[in-house]
Amino acid sequence: MGLFESVKSIDWEQESFPTYQDLGFLPLFAVFFPTIRFLLDRFVFEKLASLVIYGRMSTNKSDNIKDRKKNSPKVRKFKESAWKCIYYLSAELLALSVTYNEPWFSNTLYFWIGPGDQIWPDQPMKMKLKFLYMFAAGFYTYSIFALVFWETRRSDFGVSMGHHITTLVLIVLSYICRLTRAGSVILALHDASDVFLEIGKMSKYCGAESLASISFVLFALSWVVLRLIYYPFWILWSTSYQIIMTVDKEKHPNGPILYYMFNTLLYFLLVLHIFWWVLIYRMLVKQVQDRGKLSEDVRSDSESDDEHED
């Protein structure tokens, strides 16, 4: 039986409770992502970046010049954005496919009770939700190392590292403690805006200013709606208040510890959202002043793009 047939034969609707043994799949996904990225970088993104940034004529130049093009900051950062765009788009589509038809996608009360007589923590997970969790956990495990050894160093390196570590801890904690209903919606909220950001950055690197400006505006709007409105006023409201009103605290003596751990991490993410929004707002003001032209990346790079290139 081939890989496709094996995947097709899995009952993705099958329900079971999460176990520590499930986390054994996490290292496999953590290795999967750098492998896929390396292959895409080598055979797809590098050629695409050279084509859209320098044009077809660059393929006729000498090997020395072509090597310099391939190692240029614009090409390197275009490949980074292309990879992130592929991941965030696939992760968003996966999260929506897993959560969209579930009752808790549109009603946060179902994070904790229902359907039927299910009450947290006695809420089994579908196989597809387990896959989503291992997919995301593997990516953020890889991202911690990629931020140090692979990515372009940016001025918000520390903030990004804090975000990746917090997100990974939240994913693992919510999986083990059966808080995956809330976690799955949070994953769906957080990946959408990053798709627009990476499209905008790629457009900027290849000189498509209009598309870059439009993408950045869509990124800013989605950031406000999803991360600064829906996340705090629906998700955090549910994890902070709604859970207290629906879950019997006397049956869960360790509940207060988990409650404060989970919410502390979630509110820390909100602080990061606000920090990044300040940077986004400055970019919006700059974009208006420049009559719609996007002047630079939302997060400034530690190295300049203005170095000489033939």
Curated annotation (Swiss-Prot):
Enzyme Commission no: 2.3.1.-
Known tissue expression: Expressed ubiquitously at high levels. Not observed in pollen.
Keyword Coiled coil part of the UniProt annotation: no
Disruption phenotype: Elevated levels of free trihydroxy sphingoid bases as well as ceramide and glucosylceramide species with C(16) fatty acid, but reduced levels of species with C(20) to C(28) fatty acids. Spontaneous cell death accompanied by an enhanced PR1 expression at advanced age. The double mutant loh1 loh3 is embryonically lethal.
Pathway: Sphingolipid metabolism
GO molecular function terms noted in the UniProt entry: sphingosine N-acyltransferase activity
Lineage: Eukaryota, Viridiplantae, Streptophyta, Embryophyta, Tracheophyta
Chain positions with Phosphoserine modification: S300, S302
Name the UniProt record assigns to this protein: Ceramide synthase LOH1
Source organism: Arabidopsis thaliana (Mouse-ear cress)
Membrane-spanning parts: 16-36, 85-105, 131-151, 157-177, 216-236, 260-280
